[in-house]
């Protein structure tokens, strides 16, 4: 009897582990999940246009809200151009991916770093417009280039932060020859 119970327990344990593996194995898209909220440590997703990745995102929590994707907790976003070359990294507390346009907003302790030149932007909110490949913020920003920094309100830039503008600057910064 004891041997039978041991075998039964072992069988149930192995069966439940196998079922859990099957559940996780076939999830290739967020649409494969039934729940509106997915938590993980971390969740990794890619958003593509055709065969090219637009964004590669890491986050602690993903929430589907009326077709848009809400991301919470330690959001890291790699942004790519149409050739698949990384243009920048964006880090924030939370973000929203607008699925109709593939544009994105990042909120809370936002830092954007250009992969092209290492320039950094700090603010509380930015919007990444995928169709025009522009970055915008209406908030106060701190832009850091090499050893220079400039504060201001309002910011426009291309994705790789080569061509940028602060709408209402506070202070001075020297632009390089290629900017």
Set out the residue ranges of the language-model regions:
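Mature-chain termini and adjacent capping regions
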Residues: 1-179
